[in-house]
Amino acid sequence: MHVRFRHLFLLPLITLVACSQPVSKNHLSLTSLSANAQQPVVNNAWLEISQGALDFNTKKMLTLLDNKSTLCAILKGDAYGHDLTLVTPVMLKNNVQCIGVASNQELKTVRDLGFTGQLIRVRSATLKEMQQAMAYDVEELIGDKTVAEQLNNIAKLNGKVLRIHLALNSAGMSRNGLEVSKARGLNDAKTIAGLKNLTIVGIMSHYPVEDASEIKADLARFQQQAKDVIAVTGLKREKIKLHVANTFATLAVPDSWLDMVRVGGVFYGDTIASTEYKRVMTFKSNIASLNNYPKGGTVGYDRTYTLKRDSLLANIPVGYADGYRRVFSNAGHVIIQGQRLPVLGKTSMNTVIVDVTDLKKVSLGDEVVLFGKQGNAEIQAEEIEDLSGALFTEMSILWGATNKRILVD
């Protein structure tokens, strides 16, 4: 409506009349809007994180180590996509003494959740990160002399002595460790050890392969190089933690435990070294709509699938925006009512289509499992990896970044 200047004197009357009109039943009241705003958001897809499975895996690992080596729980990558705020309390409950993360946000989150134990950053960090992280009482990973010298200066200016772990390249990652097989690397280690505002509390390396025979060879190399570093620097062995073992090495090569193990995937049931640990994550959605389509019809973008029979198709409101990638187009399966069912056509941004013709009875809202178990059926990590060409960890982190995580049991 266009209101001209000469009509402005009518505005008070118009307003009075409008305000006196009854509110239509078709409009939400302010009260109902407020109540609705306080309710949890209904999600199109979500990840269920099993507290019971996580607790089981943690206890099993602690029992395996039997106090022969310190357990450092690696919770980087937002606990591999499982939600750091959900996983950390389970570590606290089980009295885990060491946690390893990567980012400053993760450092802050772990401390805010009440963890007061040993906190290690398990990657190289920028100087800005490390300067801010002094507030979180973190032990930094250092494998570069120049970085060590600059961090030492920052620590001195702040009146602090920082604990660090010296990274060696003994396993051949060529990522962030000193090459102490050469004189230059040993000299760098000696220089770092002499910095007054840094204290070396650990010497570590990291394995690039999951092969027991290679790990044993790398372990022998690390032990010799660590011995050389201790000799040239004058460090006291009893004050240094030696640690190299990741999840695979911890389970497959007990000799690699040394003073501490750094395990991550095992907490979430993600390891090829053992089938005794439980999967923690399940990826779920619900059926949004059901439609019958005739034989010969096509499904999805680019008509990549042609129906071979009259079919009942279920619309699942999850797509590549939720981390269910296009690689699952015409290849993936989901589970509904305990049966594996095929994904038809290309995955859309927010939708996948599933053939439910063979189900005896199917209804709107039925639960859909995109990863994990339902009844006796299961979508396994190996299947996800084969179809996606990605590590399952890569997928779990992606799903965690794009979907609500809910703690169950």
Curated annotation (Swiss-Prot):
GO terms for biological process: D-alanine biosynthetic process. The modification N6-(pyridoxal phosphate)lysine is found at residue 76. It is found in: Periplasm. InterPro entries: Ala_racemase (IPR000821), Ala_racemase/Decarboxylase_C (IPR009006), Ala_racemase_C (IPR011079), Ala_racemase_N (IPR001608), Ala_racemase_pyridoxalP-BS (IPR020622), PLP-binding_barrel (IPR029066), Racemase_Bsr/Lyr (IPR043698). One of its GO terms (cellular component) is cytosol. It holds the Pfam family Ala_racemase_C. Residues 1-20 form the signal peptide. Its EC number is 5.1.1.10. GO terms for molecular function: alanine racemase activity; arginine racemase activity; lysine racemase activity; pyridoxal phosphate binding. It catalyses: an L-alpha-amino acid = a D-alpha-amino acid; L-lysine = D-lysine; L-arginine = D-arginine. Keywords: Disulfide bond, Isomerase, Periplasm, Pyridoxal phosphate, Signal. Its main location: periplasm. Its cofactor is pyridoxal 5'-phosphate. Coiled coil: none annotated. It is an enzyme of class 5 (isomerase). The active site is at residues 76, 301. Disulfide bonds join 72-98. Substrate binds at residues 175, 349. Amino-acid racemase able to utilize a broad range of substrates. Belongs to the alanine racemase family. Bsr subfamily. This is Broad specificity amino-acid racemase. It comes from Yersinia pestis.
